[in-house]
Design a protein with these regions (language model features):
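N-proximal, solvent-exposed amphipathic alpha-helical segments enriched in charged/polar residues
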Residues: 44-62
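A short, acidic, amphipathic alpha-helical segment used as a generic capping/interface helix at domain edges
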Residues: 131-139
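Surface-exposed acidic, glycine-flexible loop patches that form ligand/cofactor-binding
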Residues: 64-69, 139, 160-162
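Sec-dependent bacterial lipoprotein signal peptides
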Residues: 1-25
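N-terminal segment of the mature soluble domain
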Residues: 56, 60-132, 179-185
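Amphipathic beta-strand/beta-sheet edge segments enriched in Tyr/Trp
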Residues: 26-29, 146-196
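Extracellular/periplasmic catalytic domains that process cell-envelope and extracellular macromolecules
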Residues: 140-144
Length: 197
């Protein structure tokens, strides 16, 4: 076998192995960013929008007469409904609004519909023979909410040539559970425009 043929025979596999090794050794850099910084990667719903909505809505609701009455009203929070054409984690919006309201210290929260199964399962578990009856939570002790917070997020998307305009609107309402009266309502609007080119 000639030296040239042997060299050709091993050259391609050696070249592929070297390329794979070089790709595997490529340096990957990870850095921390400011979680509160403005996110401008895309014009889709993002972390900046989530923070702005939660803070704005909580600030507004904490000024509502039903809340400032001073008796720490009990609120249940329904998951914000997504009426946009894109996937938006509305549970994250709902949880962020609840967290901002909780920080305000003016409301208490009753278990919501999504958490009811876990709550009743825990009560049933404590009713088993494995728990001390004197310390176990009894059925019929849960507190009902005085108010129900609910809402939705909608969007309008327009495209013209290299311009994409996205308008989001989040609307929340606080309903009195006892009498069905609307106690508070507000909305937060966000507009994002992207130009290609």
């Amino acid at each position: 076998m000639s030296a040239a043929l042997t060299m050709r025979r091993f050259a391609l596999p050696a070249l592929l192995a070297a390329a794979a090794l070089a790709a595997g050794c490529a340096k990957e850099t990870t850095r921390y960013g400011d979680a509160r910084g403005v996110e401008t990667v895309t014009n889709q719903f993002g972390s900046t929008d989530l923070q702005m909505i939660a803070e704005s809505m909580a600030r507004s609701m904490l000024k509502a007469p039903a809340i400032v009455s001073g008796n720490l009203p009990i609120v249940t929070v329904q998951e914000v409904r997504n009426k946009t054409s894109e996937y938006i984690d509305t549970r994250a919006i709902t949880d962020s609004i609840r967290a901002e309201l909780q920080k305000g210290g003016k409301v208490r929260f009753a278990v919501d519909a999504s958490g009811m199964t876990q709550q009743t399962d825990e009560i049933k578990r404590q009713s088993s023979e494995y728990y001390n009856r004197e310390q176990a939570v009894e059925k019929g002790q849960m507190v009902g909410a005085e108010y129900r917070l609910e809402g939705n997020i909608t969007s309008i998307v327009k495209r013209v040539e290299d311009i994409k305009d996205v308008y989001y609107k989040v609307n929340l309402q606080l309903w009195n559970v006892r009498n069905g009266l609307l106690e508070w309502s507000d909305e937060k609007e966000i507009r994002k425009t992207t130009t290609r080119g």
